[in-house]
Swiss-Prot record:
Assembly description: Self-associates (via leucine zipper). Interacts (via leucine zipper) with ZIPK/DAPK3 (via leucine zipper). Interacts with MAD4.
Lineage: Eukaryota, Metazoa, Chordata, Craniata, Vertebrata
Claim: Cytoplasm is one of the keywords in the record: no
Organism in which the protein naturally occurs: Pan troglodytes
Name the record gives this protein: T-complex protein 10A homolog 1
Similarity remark: Belongs to the TCP10 family.
Domain of life per record: Eukaryota
Gene: TCP10L
Keywords (A to Z) from UniProt: Coiled coil, Nucleus, Repressor, Transcription, Transcription regulation
Region of interest called Disordered, as start-end residue ranges on this chain: 1-26, 175-217
Bias-annotated ranges (Basic and acidic residues): 7-19, 175-192
GO CC, any one term: nucleus
Coiled coil: 69-110
InterPro entries: TCP10L/CENPJ
Keyword Membrane: no
Compartment(s): Nucleus
Amino acid sequence: MLAGQLEARDPKEGTHPEDPCPGAGAVTEKTAVAAEVLTEDCNAGEMPPLQQQVIRLHQELGRQKSLWADVHGKLRSHIDALREQNMELREKLRALQLQRWKARKKSAASPHAGQESHTLALEPAFGKMSPLSADEETIPKYIGRKNQSATLLGQFSSSKGDPLCLSSPMSLKIERISSWKTPPQEKRDKSLSRRRQDRRATPTGRPTPCAERRGGV
């Protein structure tokens, strides 16, 4: 404004004696100013759509960040739950291994523990069984051998045709008792009775006890 007023007051100052058209510099300046104003107006008209696009992108980025944060939190909680479950399973596995180790150690320390427990389980049903003494073990063997020898003597006398010896109830009772014995013991008793029979064989010409009874009858 001040420059225009000065130019209007002093028109001779802006002109040159050699200028063909005085006032050409002022027109050029006005044209430049008008062009700058038009450029600014165009830029001002283009800015709102860009700003809206930037705002939309910023909002979309915020949404994506919130979604990723939510997913990350869920994954973190799931990982923590899996860690706790893994720790619990490891503790259970250690406890089982410790129990197995204790059981193996106990079985190695007491190999007859199973037999003792089985005996203790049978005691309430059958009562406590005391072991036989040495005399009680030898008496049945002696009785069995004696009965076997008597049976063999009765068989030897019956082979000579004595009906009294065949019908003797004592011999039948002895045979029943001897039949209860086991085969290995019976074989041993037979061998012993044969030896005794050979030693106690009646001499020739001497009557047997059964023959004497028959003669007396």
